[in-house]
């Protein structure tokens, strides 16, 4: 950059103060100065960024003045002259050159800089001016959608401070995207409407389709919020002074939003993005779809992912929320749903952070009294078996869950109290001998490898695992498990009291517990643990050494 701030200020002052068109050629000189030096990793090292930011703001002031003078507005055909039209067209070409420079800054700078944020703000302020001065006639509704479309391309081309998929959500941390989302997209209804509309058209353009589909992280950063213009409680403003009435068409917005989502869901998603989408799908995606049933294929594929990909992890668990929403609201019929739900229950489930989410949903799915006792018994038995190798924080969730299931499905009580194995004082010697033989030869009939919960023989089994838990090393688990050795007087447990327990909360509860009586302790006080290195056993002889005869 050759021009100094003082020179830029002088040129800008002459251009904005006077209406002399001879000075307008200086605009081209200023635009040509708006160039980012090559092979630069940051602009803060010198005055370059400061000068470029000042140049951008000066050019914005100049073009705002040109808008107010009407130099960028084509005159009506009656008042038009050839000279006037040529001048306006020349001004517009210079104006387009400035916008192109701004877009280049937004899309090409690979490092975080305030210049990019300034360029974004200036570009959108220019779009606001266009909505007033580029309308077909004064006061006519207008939104500069072509200008906006170019901005979308620049945003999706930007890699400013890009740390794609590093966040646990899989969303982009691109500074430009974050700024655009927080400052514009989540605040203005017209920007949301035209963004979805133009994005949809770009997805249909082969020239830009690949660019958009590869940057799902930016899309997630943009739409992962509750302030969509189709939301009932969204309190959004209008960005341009007089937008077209089309922005009130909620159905069209939902249709575009839906098409964009479906296109991106068919693209390449990272595992983190997959999880993030499934986490928000039931609250932030389905309500804004015009036809939510179009998500059926995506959700069923996600739910079935476990059988085809052992590394899928929690994806089927997260897909449950969306599936349940479609089943509840749109009567989605899913074949073998309970078989798939049963297959999700495995040792890994007890260690994932979405365990509470899964148990909340499973509580709903297994609450129906129309379910067969064999099916419910399989879920009870499999959960009980998993407690033998689960952490205490998971076990304290499973125990009340099993208790509630047995209360809802009394036919499963036989797994706890089987009359065939109970002796009574009126039995004959032969009956006593037969009972003894029956107990000695007992083999648990439960087939843990069977994938169909109707065929596991769980109802013929017993919950001996719960008896093992009564002797668990953790006192909370042992105490809680003993509820099964008592009469079932409690109606049910409130599962919310148990779902969010972890090692930290268990330790905190134990350490903060107030004891009614202090435990009785007996101990001896020692001044040393070992004898001195020189073998001096004087202290040992006096009884002040814990390990006499051992030198350290």
Swiss-Prot record:
Q: Does the keyword Nucleus apply?
A: yes
User: Which keywords, in A-to-Z order, does the entry hold?
Assistant: Nucleus, Ribonucleoprotein, Ribosome biogenesis, rRNA processing
**Which InterPro entries does its entry note?**
CCAAT-binding_factor, Noc4
Would you say which domain of life the source belongs to?
Eukaryota
Q: Which GO terms of the cellular component aspect does the record hold?
A: 90S preribosome; cytosol; Noc4p-Nop14p complex; nucleolus; nucleoplasm; nucleus; preribosome, small subunit precursor; small-subunit processome
Locate the coiled-coil region(s) and give their ranges. Answer: none
Q: Which GO terms of type biological process are on file? A: endonucleolytic cleavage in 5'-ETS of tricistronic rRNA transcript (SSU-rRNA, 5.8S rRNA, LSU-rRNA); endonucleolytic cleavage in ITS1 to separate SSU-rRNA from 5.8S rRNA and LSU-rRNA from tricistronic rRNA transcript (SSU-rRNA, 5.8S rRNA, LSU-rRNA); endonucleolytic cleavage to generate mature 5'-end of SSU-rRNA from (SSU-rRNA, 5.8S rRNA, LSU-rRNA); maturation of SSU-rRNA; ribosomal small subunit assembly; ribosomal small subunit biogenesis; rRNA processing
Principal location class = nucleus
Q: List the subcellular locations.
A: Nucleus, Nucleolus
Say which family it is in: Belongs to the CBF/MAK21 family.
**UniProt function note:** Involved in nucleolar processing of pre-18S ribosomal RNA and ribosome assembly. Has a role in the nuclear export of 40S pre-ribosomal subunit to the cytoplasm. Its subcellular location and association with pre-40S subunit are unaffected by RPS19 disruptions, suggesting it acts before the ribosomal protein.
**Description of how the protein assembles with itself and partners:** Interacts with NOP14 and MPP10. Interacts with snoRNA U3. Component of the ribosomal small subunit (SSU) processome composed of at least 40 protein subunits and snoRNA U3.
Q: What else is known?
A: Present with 1630 molecules/cell in log phase SD medium.
Protein's name in the database: Nucleolar complex protein 4
- Name the source organism: Saccharomyces cerevisiae (strain ATCC 204508 / S288c)
Question: Which lineage is the organism of this entry classified under, starting from the top rank?
Answer: Eukaryota, Fungi, Dikarya, Ascomycota, Saccharomycotina
What would be the name of the gene that encodes this protein?
NOC4
């Amino acid at each position: 950059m050759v021009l100094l701030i003082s020179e830029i200020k002088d040129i800008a002052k002459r251009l904005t103060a006077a209406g002399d068109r001879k000075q307008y050629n200086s605009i081209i000189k200023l635009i040509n100065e708006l160039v980012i030096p090559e092979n630069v990793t940051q602009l803060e090292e010198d005055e370059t960024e400061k000068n470029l930011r000042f140049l951008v703001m000066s050019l914005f002031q100049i073009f705002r003045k040109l808008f107010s003078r009407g130099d960028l507005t084509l005159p009506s055909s009656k008042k038009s002259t050839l000279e006037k039209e040529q001048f306006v067209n020349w001004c517009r070409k210079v104006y387009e050159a400035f916008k192109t420079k701004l877009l280049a800054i937004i899309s090409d700078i690979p490092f975080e800089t305030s210049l990019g944020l300034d360029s974004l703000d200036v570009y959108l302020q220019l779009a606001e001016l266009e909505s007033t001065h580029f309308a077909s006639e004064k006061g006519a509704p207008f939104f500069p959608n072509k200008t906006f479309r170019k901005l979308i391309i620049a945003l999706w081309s930007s890699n400013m401070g890009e740390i794609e998929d590093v966040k646990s959500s899989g969303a982009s941390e691109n500074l430009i995207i974050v700024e655009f989302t927080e400052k514009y997209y989540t605040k203005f209804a017209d920007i949301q409407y035209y963004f979805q509309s133009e994005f949809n058209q770009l997805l249909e353009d082969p020239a830009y389709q690949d660019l958009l589909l590869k940057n799902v992280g930016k899309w997630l950063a943009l739409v992962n919020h509750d302030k969509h213009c189709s939301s009932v409680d969204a309190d959004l403003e209008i960005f341009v002074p007089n937008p077209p009435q089309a922005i009130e068409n909620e159905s069209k917005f939902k249709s575009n939003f839906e098409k964009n989502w479906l296109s991106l869901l068919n693209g390449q998603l990272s595992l983190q993005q997959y999880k993030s989408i499934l986490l928000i799908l039931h609250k932030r995606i389905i309500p804004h779809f015009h036809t939510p049933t179009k998500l059926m294929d995506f959700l069923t594929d996600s739910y079935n992912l476990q059988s085809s990909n052992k590394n899928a992890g929690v994806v089927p668990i997260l897909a449950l929320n969306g599936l349940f929403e479609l089943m509840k609201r749109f009567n989605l019929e899913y074949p073998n749903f309970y078989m798939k739900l049963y297959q999700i229950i495995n040792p890994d489930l007890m260690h994932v952070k979405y365990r509470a989410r899964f148990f909340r949903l499973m509580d709903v799915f297994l609450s129906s009294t129309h379910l067969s006792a064999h099916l419910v018994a399989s879920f009870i038995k499999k959960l009980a078996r998993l407690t033998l190798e689960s952490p205490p924080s998971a076990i304290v969730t499973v125990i009340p869950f099993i208790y509630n299931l047995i209360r809802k499905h009394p036919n499963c009580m036989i797994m706890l109290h089987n009359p065939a194995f109970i002796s009574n004082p009126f039995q004959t010697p032969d009956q006593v001998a037969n009972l003894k033989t029956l107990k000695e030869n007992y083999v648990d009939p439960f087939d843990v490898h069977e994938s169909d919960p109707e065929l596991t023989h769980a109802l013929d089994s017993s919950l001996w695992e719960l008896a093992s838990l009564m002797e668990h090393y953790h006192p909370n688990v042992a105490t809680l498990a003993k509820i099964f050795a008592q009469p079932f007087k409690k109606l049910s447990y409130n599962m919310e009291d148990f779902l969010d327990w972890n090692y930290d909360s268990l330790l905190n509860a134990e350490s903060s517990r107030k004891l009614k009586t202090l435990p009785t302790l007996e101990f001896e006080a020692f001044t040393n643990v070992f004898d001195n290195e020189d073998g001096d056993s004087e202290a040992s002889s006096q009884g002040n050494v814990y390990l006499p005869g051992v030198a350290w």
